[in-house]
Amino acid sequence: MKNIRNFSIIAHIDHGKSTIADRFIQFCGGLSDREMSAQVLDSMDIEKERGITIKSQSVTLDYQARNNETYQLNFIDTPGHVDFSYEVSRSLSACEGALLIVDASQGVEAQTIANCYTALDQGLEVVPVLNKIDLPAADPDRVVDEIEDVIGVEAHDAVYASAKSGMGIEDILEQIVEKIPAPKGNIDSPIKALIIDSWFDNYLGVVSLIRVIDGEIRTKTKIKIFSNGKEHLVDEVGVFRPKRKKTNSLKAGEVGFLIASIKNIDGAPVGDTITGAKNSASKPLEGFKPVQPRVFSGIFPISGEDYEKFRDALAKLRLNDAALQYEPENSDALGFGFRIGFLGLLHMEIVQERLEREYNLNLITTAPTVIYEILDTKGVIYRIDSPSKIPINQSIAEFREPIITANILVTDEYVGVIISLCVEKRGVQKNITYMGGQVSLVYELPLNEVVFDFFDRLKSISRGFASMDYRFERYQKSDLIRLDIMINQEPVDVLALIIHRNDSVHKGRELVEKMKKLIPRQMFDVTIQACIGSKIISRSNVKALRKNVTAKCYGGDISRKRKLLDKQKKGKKRMRSVGKVNIPQEVFLAVLHID
């Protein structure tokens, strides 16, 4: 056990984390050169295309150190994006140390800080590494100062490396062996293991990535899952090198996979504890918390016939993604679909893209919303995740919205524009710190202002230099109202929004104008109205397509023409009362992009 090292890598998106992992695998001979592909551990197509890691992965390598001893290195690859921070915290809790990888040209970014603090809070040993040292723009001295000033980790002896060329890889492995402590644990104690991640395999059922804390798990051992008390027989255990390799057992301190014919992913929740069925541990490991979605959106199949297929696709995705929560939703405008909860906007995009790509579905997505609290006059608190769930006739004492604390890191030339953006989004400045050329801004912002287009605008006004990380703070009383959109006097439930009263008139007008351009002309007039309660705040018409019914009247009496026009008018009126307006997908997306 003293020769085991469990470690994780903390890095911002695109700072070279997955490439360093590839070099480790190559250096320790995990795969032959022929089998090596770029970013071995990013197994989903979408991960490779976007160049990001979404699911946690793991690999076990044997490393012959300079002191001639062989060490078992268990490396757990983690996602870098703010939406997947729960996956990061679970992966970190299975390790004794973490490599902090920072791009030597870009310096420290907000996401790195957040994950690094998580690691330090859990008592991990952090080993700094400067990657991309061979870039012409690399400035290692500045970055070392930044790591020490911003994060507070000793970095003067950081390893200089270039994952692309393979420089410094052996030095990093030596640092892991020297600095990261060996795991603690007792092989004779009752079994205790942490589920780091779970995914579904069509043939094997649920495969769980686990870190054994105490005891030893062998095949045919009977185990128990702590949170639901269910018992299972272990079919197979083993390690990833990075291909799956069967072993006889997993001992205390080791990381590997476990298959126990568990039928669905809820049977092995991520972050939960596994123990022996007969000789059980008395209490579970700390830190398990069910994942709470923060952003909700309605997703509907464009064709009603796809509903069953959509439901099955969601159930399959849910097998691999414990953070995904959904419930059926019925909309007058869009028919049957699901209200789905996500960790954040990137998570939402990825889920929608996977549904469309892997399951061949055409979907319409409504504007994302967050969870609000409503206090009624009787003192009862409701939580709602959709504007259509707001009780219209009940008296609301106060409306509360979720507030987040955002930590924004940016170069000093863009501070002005970012402060303006935060003020526009109803932000309250809490702190501002200048560190060399970097500035750290801390703002409290309403989450629903961030959900729409905050990230996109932050990136565009700072030319991509700003990075941001946020955490949920509290619910706070706010003057919010429900804005409804009516098409031909019929409210469209999926277009309703919850917004601040001060923005309502401006946003209502803007939305109506945008929809006027996007709704195609019909055979009858289409009226678009924005209203708050019974008060109409904006209105616009999409003119009808008309046939020239008087074309064949040459000269003659005016009453003949009028008779034809009146007949057309009556027909249009009747058509309008029975006609349905087809709303294209762009209209729902327009709700997302109102400034």
Swiss-Prot record:
<dbReference type="InterPro" id="IPR006297">
    <property type="entry name" value="EF-4"/>
</dbReference>
<dbReference type="InterPro" id="IPR013842">
    <property type="entry name" value="LepA_CTD"/>
</dbReference>
<dbReference type="GO" id="GO:0043022">
    <property type="term" value="F:ribosome binding"/>
</dbReference>
<feature type="binding site">
    <location>
        <begin position="131"/>
        <end position="134"/>
    </location>
    <ligand>
        <name>GTP</name>
    </ligand>
</feature>
<dbReference type="InterPro" id="IPR027417">
    <property type="entry name" value="P-loop_NTPase"/>
</dbReference>
<dbReference type="InterPro" id="IPR005225">
    <property type="entry name" value="Small_GTP-bd"/>
</dbReference>
<keyword id="KW-0547">Nucleotide-binding</keyword>
<keyword id="KW-0342">GTP-binding</keyword>
<keyword id="KW-0378">Hydrolase</keyword>
<dbReference type="GO" id="GO:0045727">
    <property type="term" value="P:positive regulation of translation"/>
</dbReference>
<keyword id="KW-1003">Cell membrane</keyword>
<feature type="domain" description="tr-type G">
    <location>
        <begin position="2"/>
        <end position="184"/>
    </location>
</feature>
<dbReference type="InterPro" id="IPR035647">
    <property type="entry name" value="EFG_III/V"/>
</dbReference>
<dbReference type="Pfam" id="PF06421">
    <property type="entry name" value="LepA_C"/>
</dbReference>
<dbReference type="InterPro" id="IPR038363">
    <property type="entry name" value="LepA_C_sf"/>
</dbReference>
<dbReference type="Pfam" id="PF03144">
    <property type="entry name" value="GTP_EFTU_D2"/>
</dbReference>
<dbReference type="InterPro" id="IPR031157">
    <property type="entry name" value="G_TR_CS"/>
</dbReference>
<feature type="binding site">
    <location>
        <begin position="14"/>
        <end position="19"/>
    </location>
    <ligand>
        <name>GTP</name>
    </ligand>
</feature>
<dbReference type="GO" id="GO:0005886">
    <property type="term" value="C:plasma membrane"/>
</dbReference>
<dbReference type="GO" id="GO:0003924">
    <property type="term" value="F:GTPase activity"/>
</dbReference>
<keyword id="KW-0648">Protein biosynthesis</keyword>
<comment type="similarity">
    <text>Belongs to the TRAFAC class translation factor GTPase superfamily. Classic translation factor GTPase family. LepA subfamily.</text>
</comment>
<keyword id="KW-0472">Membrane</keyword>
<dbReference type="InterPro" id="IPR000795">
    <property type="entry name" value="T_Tr_GTP-bd_dom"/>
</dbReference>
<dbReference type="GO" id="GO:0097216">
    <property type="term" value="F:guanosine tetraphosphate binding"/>
</dbReference>
<dbReference type="Pfam" id="PF00009">
    <property type="entry name" value="GTP_EFTU"/>
</dbReference>
<dbReference type="InterPro" id="IPR004161">
    <property type="entry name" value="EFTu-like_2"/>
</dbReference>
<dbReference type="InterPro" id="IPR000640">
    <property type="entry name" value="EFG_V-like"/>
</dbReference>
<dbReference type="GO" id="GO:0005525">
    <property type="term" value="F:GTP binding"/>
</dbReference>
<dbReference type="GO" id="GO:0003746">
    <property type="term" value="F:translation elongation factor activity"/>
</dbReference>
<protein>
    <recommendedName>
        <fullName>Elongation factor 4</fullName>
        <ecNumber>3.6.5.n1</ecNumber>
    </recommendedName>
</protein>
<keyword id="KW-0997">Cell inner membrane</keyword>
<comment type="function">
    <text>Required for accurate and efficient protein synthesis under certain stress conditions. May act as a fidelity factor of the translation reaction, by catalyzing a one-codon backward translocation of tRNAs on improperly translocated ribosomes. Back-translocation proceeds from a post-translocation (POST) complex to a pre-translocation (PRE) complex, thus giving elongation factor G a second chance to translocate the tRNAs correctly. Binds to ribosomes in a GTP-dependent manner.</text>
</comment>
<dbReference type="InterPro" id="IPR035654">
    <property type="entry name" value="LepA_IV"/>
</dbReference>
<dbReference type="Pfam" id="PF00679">
    <property type="entry name" value="EFG_C"/>
</dbReference>
